[in-house]
Design a protein with these regions (language model features):
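Catalytic cores of the polymerase beta-like nucleotidyltransferase superfamily
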Residues: 1-334
Length: 334
């Protein structure tokens, strides 16, 4: 049975966070750790990324952190958010507590400054709607207005309100990503609403960039097989790209780039179009494209393949002979 203070801030972060909380108090504002970091602290998982929410101006607090511990800060003015990379290795997303409203589905929200409870309510799932105070007089105190601890203990992914997937369809991808990562399940009502969101094709309301970004996050997950199987079962994969399925070759590669290469090659003739839709860096796209061309061809490559290209082709075509991947240099009229 957990005690009254069920989650604690790791000692290695306490000095920095206590100092930020103390400075926030001097400025007359309240400060909290929010989101996934609190969840991970509770689960005993290490993290170097911490979200902080303030009920006041963030600018001087971001400046204080960089001046005190060194590093850099970048401001994202649309949401008054600062990304602070400290020289200690700790990464802080420092935001103004806010309320969000969505003018229409699939677009970024309109925001207004607000309190910590409203800031919790704008979160994707109850498990991420948990806050810890970093104020001097209440350092580490838990604020759990929507039952985060209870749902984490039960291994449940639960949205906070019925319009959640309509407001932000990226939450559909995050629901299966977190469920796969932690081995959790969707709450019955959340699952019902997700199925309806798939039926209504909510993900297609997103820009291709936002949908791609969420899928590439899934591609980085250790439990990618479990996640893709969930997406297939719910009909979500076909909304990312028609014909996309789990391929056993994904078990035979090690890197995120190789995974993407396997997906491209496993799609056959439509692989090139899928690759273009992913909008990855030009150099990576070209490397995968060359692997796809060899994968689709019955001929040996005209130039030496990179280790990544070889790994992808062997994963998709485990029966292809080694010599078939060696370059064929043409001479004369041959």
């Amino acid at each position: 049975m957990k005690g009254k203070n069920p989650v604690s801030i790791p000692k290695k972060y306490q000095e920095i966070l206590f100092s930020i909380g103390t400075y926030a108090e001097k400025l007359g504002t309240k400060a909290w750790i929010v989101g996934g970091a609190v969840r991970d602290f509770y689960l005993g998982r290490d993290t170097l990324d911490i979200d902080l929410s303030f009920e006041g101006n963030v600018d001087p607090l971001a400046g204080f952190a960089v001046k005190r511990w060194g590093g850099s800060k970048n401001k994202f003015s649309q949401f008054s958010t600062f990304r602070v990379n400290l020289s200690t290795g700790l990464k802080l997303d420092m935001v103004r507590a806010r309320r969000e409203s969505y003018p229409r589905s699939g677009v970024l929200p309109e925001v207004t400054p607000s309190c910590i409870k409203d800031d919790m309510f704008r979160r994707d799932f109850t498990a991420n709607a948990w806050a810890l105070s970093i104020m001097p007089g209440s350092f580490g105190a838990s604020f759990d207005p929507f039952g985060a601890q209870k749902d984490i203990d039960a291994g449940i992914i639960r949205i906070l309100h019925p319009k959640s997937f309509l407001d932000d369809p990226t939450r559909m991808c995050r629901a299966v990503r977190f469920a796969g990562r932690f081995g959790w399940k969707l709450a019955p009502k959340t699952e019902e609403l997700l199925k309806e969101a798939v039926k209504q094709q909510y993900p297609l309301l997103l820009s291709r960039e936002r949908l791609t970004r969420e899928f590439l996050k899934i591609n980085k997950e250790k439990e990618i097989k479990r996640i893709l199987e969930m997406m297939r079962a719910y009909g979500m994969l076909q909304l990312v790209y028609p014909g996309l399925e789990w391929h056993d070759g994904l078990n035979r590669v090690k890197t995120v780039d190789e995974r993407l290469g396997v997906m491209v090659c496993s799609l056959g003739k439509s692989g090139e179009e899928f690759l273009k839709s992913m909008r990855v860096k030009k150099e990576l796209a070209q490397e995968i494209l060359e692997a796809w061309k060899v994968s689709e061809s019955c001929h040996a490559p005209l130039r030496a393949l990179t280790p990544m290209q070889q790994a992808v082709i062997r994963a998709v075509h485990p029966g292809r002979k080694k010599y078939a991947l060696e370059p064929c240099f043409l001479r004369g009229r041959d």
